[in-house]
């Protein structure tokens, strides 16, 4: 009996040691976030072991775990019709909300899920529930795109998928089929999906052949640049779940099918050091000392290496491509973008990406709403139902949908 108690105590101590991580007191539901983070870390470690054993790529294994535990079939309710189909060869899940008697045509959002361009699915519970709620509360048609993921495809194939699916949807006959008003269509996405949505928005507003333009874009804690991994939010939140800095840098390397040997050099900005000529013209476009308010910059100092590793951008030139990093786009491109909503979270390495993009858009004359949550963390908006229901998840979702309701 005594040995059993000792063993149980030891196991509980080990579990507590594994689960506990120091978190800021201001973050929403800290113990619940620790449990969520521990679960995700466990899945990552299992997938890394599978990769080490040569059984599968670690990202395929990790996504298999995520999708297996969360996949949801296309189930319609009395209020929302849900169907799986494809648009120009790209899988989509369509959510058709209830019509308003006084409005024969509905508004619509094309939604792009997050997951570091490598994980998740439009068909997992979190995104299915989000899009169902959007369709019902907005009386809208939501098109959730099931774009292809790393490592099956790499940049720019993810962009191609969302462009093809969205262009197909914007055809007059397709909009008519779903009873959608051509003048009330927007694009949206979270995290890596926000990256793809921003890239698509820039591309569409330069496409003179498109008859139907996007009315709004709504970007949820978007990832927007890979030149500076030492912005104040990257420094402040380098170890904060569920997106530590080293994980975000690895997602970038994976997106470009790059070399993991570059990760540590990129973390300290060796890839954009002063001797890397390719990056010199772009630095002003993400100069956070001028783009961020002093309340954020505080005592943080820019990390600018005099000499670094020019081989990184030579082997991965996509790092400097505005299609992958919309924050570095030309000012002339930004000035034609539609009304924009950007949601940022305090406890997120990507916080400053969103704030800097909002500033650049405002400078270009775009109407922008920056919605910041002091207790938010990366990914929080999809965590709204038990057992992963967070107070800030519900508040961010409600704020996001309210903005869409007022502006779309």
From Swiss-Prot:
Entry keyword set? Cell membrane, Endoplasmic reticulum, Glycoprotein, Hydrolase, Lipid degradation, Lipid metabolism, Membrane, Microsome, Signal-anchor, Transmembrane, Transmembrane helix
**Which residues, by range, are in coiled-coil regions?**
none
Among Pfam families, the record links this protein to: Abhydrolase_3
Q: Which residues are glycosylated?
A: 270, 287, 389
Q: What class of enzyme is it?
A: hydrolase
Per the UniProt entry, the disulfide pairs are none
Q: GO cellular component terms?
A: endoplasmic reticulum; plasma membrane
Membrane topology is: Single-pass type II membrane protein
| InterPro entries reported for this sequence | AB_hydrolase_3, AB_hydrolase_fold, Arylacetamide_deacetylase, GDXG_lipolytic_enzyme, Lipase_GDXG_put_SER_AS
Tell where it localizes. Answer: Cell membrane; Microsome
Q: Which GO terms describe its molecular function?
A: acetylalkylglycerol acetylhydrolase activity; serine hydrolase activity
TM regions (residue ranges): 5-25
| Modification note | N-glycosylated.
Report the active site residues: 191, 348, 378
Which PANTHER family does this entry report, sorted A to Z? AB HYDROLASE SUPERFAMILY PROTEIN C4A8.06C (PTHR48081), NEUTRAL CHOLESTEROL ESTER HYDROLASE 1 (PTHR48081:SF29)
Q: Which family does it belong to?
A: Belongs to the 'GDXG' lipolytic enzyme family.
Known function: Hydrolyzes 2-acetyl monoalkylglycerol ether (1-O-alkyl-2-acetyl-sn-glycerol), the penultimate precursor of the pathway for de novo synthesis of platelet-activating factor. May be responsible for the hydrolysis of cholesterol esters (such as cholesteryl (9Z-octadecenoate)) in macrophages. Also involved in organ detoxification by hydrolyzing exogenous organophosphorus compounds.
Protein name, as recorded? Neutral cholesterol ester hydrolase 1
Look up and give the organism this protein is from. Bos taurus
Which gene codes for it?
Answer: NCEH1
């Amino acid at each position: 009996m005594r040995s059993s108690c000792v063993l149980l105590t030891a196991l509980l101590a080990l579990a507590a040691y594994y689960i506990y991580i120091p978190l800021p007191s201001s973050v929403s539901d800290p113990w619940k976030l620790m449990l969520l983070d521990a679960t995700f870390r466990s899945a990552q470690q299992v997938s890394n072991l599978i990769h080490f054993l040569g059984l599968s790529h670690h990202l395929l294994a990790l996504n298999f775990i995520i999708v297996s535990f969360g996949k949801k079939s296309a189930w319609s309710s009395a209020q929302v019709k849900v169907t799986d189909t494809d648009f120009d060869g790209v899988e989509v899940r369509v959510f058709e909300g209830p019509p308003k008697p006084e409005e024969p045509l509905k508004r619509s959002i094309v939604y792009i899920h997050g997951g570091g361009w490598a994980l998740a699915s439009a068909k997992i519970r979190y995104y299915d529930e989000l899009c169902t709620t959007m369709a019902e509360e907005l009386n809208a048609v939501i098109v959730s795109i099931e774009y292809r993921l790393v490592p099956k495809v790499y940049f720019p194939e993810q962009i191609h998928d969302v462009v093809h699916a969205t262009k197909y949807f914007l055809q007059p006959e397709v909009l008519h089929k779903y009873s959608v008003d051509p003048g009330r269509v927007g694009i949206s996405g979270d995290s890596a999906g926000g990256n793809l949505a921003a890239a698509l928005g820039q591309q569409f507003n330069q496409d003179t052949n498109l008859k139907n333009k996007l009315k709004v874009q709504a970007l949820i804690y978007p990832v927007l640049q890979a030149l500076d991994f030492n912005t104040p939010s990257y420094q402040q939140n380098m170890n904060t779940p569920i997106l530590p800095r080293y994980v975000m840098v690895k997602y970038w390397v994976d997106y470009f099918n790059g070399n993991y040997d570059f990760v540590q050099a990129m973390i300290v900005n060796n890839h954009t050091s002063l001797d890397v000529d390719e990056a010199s013209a772009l630095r002003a476009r993400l100069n956070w000392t001028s783009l961020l308010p002093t309340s954020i910059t505080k005592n943080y100092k820019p990390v600018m290496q005099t000499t670094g590793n020019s081989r990184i951008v030579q082997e991965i030139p996509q790092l400097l491509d505005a299609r992958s990093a919309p924050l570095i786009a030309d000012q002339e491109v930004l000035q034609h973008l539609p009304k924009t909503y950007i949601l940022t979270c305090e406890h997120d390495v990507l916080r400053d990406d969103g704030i800097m993009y909002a500033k650049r858009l405002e400078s270009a004359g775009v109407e922008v709403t920056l919605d910041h949550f002091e207790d938010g963390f990366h990914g929080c908006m999809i965590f709204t139902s038990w057992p992963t229901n967070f107070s800030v998840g519900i508040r961010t979702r409600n704020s996001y949908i309210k903005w869409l309701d007022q502006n779309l």
